[in-house]
Curated annotation (Swiss-Prot):
Residues that bind Mg(2+): S53, T75
Free-text function comment from the UniProt entry: Necessary for normal cell division and for the maintenance of normal septation.
Family that this chain belongs to: Belongs to the TRAFAC class TrmE-Era-EngA-EngB-Septin-like GTPase superfamily. EngB GTPase family.
Binding site for GTP: 46-53, 73-77, 91-94, 158-161, 189-191
Limits of the EngB-type G domain: 38-210
PROSITE patterns: G_ENGB
Annotated protein name in UniProt: Probable GTP-binding protein EngB
MF terms in GO: GTP binding; metal ion binding
């Protein structure tokens, strides 16, 4: 068996990890509450109402895991989910919601910045962007923050079932990444149609495998 076939076989095996249900294990609203897990962590971050909770539920095979709401700004803490003691999925608070008080926004920023700087086991961040809206200024700032903290990330375009023209969106993403001198995966996902779910799971499994 060739090395490539061995790698692909291992990735398929790791992909089966996501057939299990993840469980909520901790929530942190301030720095003191941040848990210290020895397991590898993969985080999800995006603008409020980008579809983050729905995607996490799909990835973790648990429809009730992350609370899904039509109200932006619902996720107000960092939530940690344990996937059969193999992986920690991290749900970061959404950004860019104008109705959240400035004091709360400041608290979120401090909390998220600290987590990104100090988490030794954070292997990858998934930057979620609404494919209908394109890359906004807040998204760019988060990408810059991730690179400033030397965090690998990939771009996940959500709600892909509602968009037909992806050529311009891909070009926009590539042009932005070029300004950062960075390259990464661009994955289109839809929690409704399940498009991209397998590709995303495989990318996460590959990330964990490379870190072993």
């Amino acid at each position: 068996m060739t090395d490539e076939k061995v790698i692909n076989k291992k990735l398929v095996g790791d992909n089966k990890l996501f057939r299990h249900q993840a469980k909520f294990v901790a929530g942190a609203m301030d720095i003191k509450q941040l848990p210290n897990f020895a397991l590898p962590q993969i985080a999800f971050v995006g603008k409020s109402n980008v579809g983050k909770s729905s995607l996490i539920n799909t990835i973790c095979n648990n429809k009730k895991l992350a609370k899904v709401s039509n109200t932006p700004g619902r996720t107000r803490q960092i939530n940690f989910f344990n996937l059969v003691d193999k992986l920690i999925i991290v749900d970061l608070p959404g950004y860019g919601f104008a109705q959240v008080p400035n004091q709360v926004k400041d608290q979120w920023e401090i909390l998220i910045n600290h987590y990104l700087r100090k988490s030794d086991n954070l292997k990858l961040v998934n930057l979620l962007i609404d494919s209908r809206r394109g890359i906004k200024e807040n998204d760019k700032k988060v990408a810059e923050l991730l690179l400033a903290n030397k965090r690998d990330f990939q771009i996940i375009f959500t709600k892909s079932d509602k968009v037909t023209d992806r050529k311009n969106l891909n070009l926009e993403a590539q042009n932005f990444l070029a300004t950062l001198n960075y390259s990464c995966n661009l994955i289109y996902v839809s929690s409704r149609s399940k498009e991209g779910a397998r590709e995303l799971k495989t990318s996460l499994a590959k990330c964990i495998k490379l870190e072993k």
